[in-house]
């Protein structure tokens, strides 16, 4: 139902890191927000010459962490490139509401499937085959939109309350 592709890294990566204005956003796990689901900025950029060795992502793409803290989904709010610690999940058939899919991929039910499929590895890693073998419940697109909007509103309220706690 979706296209799943692994990120990649030009090597050695230090040769490709740049501060140049034409640099491409280099999405790292540390760029993912602690609260929220949208990646809107990166700390580092890579040179355009590294593009052939990585995976380009665009606003509206969904990415999923696939190693160490695996199974955390995020929605891209910017153009960028992902390394091999991420999987790109692109809805090429318009079967999913993006917010719904992002929330669904981060549920305990999905994490349990990821753990089951990754069992036996020294380090739990996901790959596109493992993620592609997961089972998802798929309500109508209209129902997905309602659920996705509802869950995003709850996330927004939680973030606002947490900010107030730390003021």
Specify the residue positions occupied by each region the protein language model found.
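Non-catalytic DNA-recognition/assembly elements of restriction-modification systems
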Residues: 1-10, 35, 133
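Short beta-strand/loop turn elements enriched in aromatics
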Residues: 18-35
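A short beta-sheet element
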Residues: 28-30, 37-108
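Short acidic/His/Gly/Ser-rich catalytic and metal-binding motifs that mark active-site loops
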Residues: 35-39, 124-126
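Specificity-determining recognition surfaces
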Residues: 104-136
């Amino acid at each position: 139902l979706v296209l799943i592709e692994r990120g990649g890294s030009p090597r050695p990566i230090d040769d490709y890191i740049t501060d140049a204005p034409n640099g491409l956003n280099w999405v790292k796990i540390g760029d993912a927000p602690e609260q929220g689901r949208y990646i809107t900025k990166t700390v580092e950029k890579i040179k355009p010459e590294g593009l052939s060795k990585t995976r380009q992502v665009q606003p509206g793409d969904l990415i999923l962490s696939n190693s160490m803290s695996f199974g955390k989904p995020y929605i891209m709010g910017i153009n960028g490139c992902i390394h091999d610690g991420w999987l790109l999940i692109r809805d090429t058939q318009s079967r999913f509401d993006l917010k719904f899919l992002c929330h669904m991929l981060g549920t305990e039910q999905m994490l349990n499937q990821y753990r089951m499929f990754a069992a036996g590895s020294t380090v739990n890693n996901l790959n596109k085959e493992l993620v592609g073998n997961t089972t998802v419940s798929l309500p109508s697109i209209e129902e997905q939109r309602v659920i996705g909007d509802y869950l995003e509103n709850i996330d927004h309220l939680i973030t606002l309350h947490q900010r107030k706690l730390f003021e």
